[in-house]
Amino acid sequence: MSNSTLNPQNSTLPPALIFDMDGVLVDNTPVQARAFQLLFRDLGLTTKALPLLKRLNGMPAGEIIQHVFRHPIPKKQLDSYAEQREFLYRTLYWDKRRALPGLVDFLKAARAEGHKIGLGTGSGGPTLSYILDHLDLRRYFDVVVGKDDVPRGKPHPDTYSRTAAKLGVAPENCIVFEDAVLGEQAAYRAGMRCVAVTTSLKAKDFQAPLTTINDFTTLTPAQLLEMLAQQPDVPQPQKRRG
């Protein structure tokens, strides 16, 4: 059963395209995991970061860190841990920042074909600049929404709902690009369809994406519209486990 239907034929404009950042614009999940692992080591924790990220990727860093402790950690302390992790991540990723193959051509084609384009991410301002401005990608986005712009992160729908509102597009006329299960669930809760980008997970890990891609070399905006016409229904979000 679906909770809404995407039907571009009912609109004079093509659907808006909303992108997550980490793992979608750039393939940085292994570096993110390495930064978490170094932080956990410094904190004397034995948690394995990569499996943790596969389960919780999409959440703000502070929320991910809280999950490794059995007791609540004061927000000020979590923020400090998140800043340490951010420093490690930037140091590790400094000379490795590259856009996902085909991304720029896809964004150019989407803009040329009249799609509004937004970015909805769990990252904050400095981290956004670290990727968007270094790679000169900000020019392609009409709207950018980060963790400081919404009260709740993914899997809550706030990030994508806010992005759609700022774009001036109804949720049912938005398609989200996500690499994380929690992000996919956020899209469905917002009433949107989702394209899964398999930089860090396998296609089978996602619930019901419109399609799955390894990068943007195998997809065009026109092909996306054809898929949408064949699969217009938005899946019901799965209930969270654990």
Task: List PLM regions with ranges.
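Residue-level detector of anion-binding/catalytic polar loops
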Residues: 46, 116, 193
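Asp-based, Mg2+/Mn2+-dependent phosphohydrolase catalytic module
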Residues: 2-3, 7-15, 108-111, 124-125, ...
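Residue-level signature of catalytic and energy-coupling elements of molecular machines
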Residues: 36, 121, 156
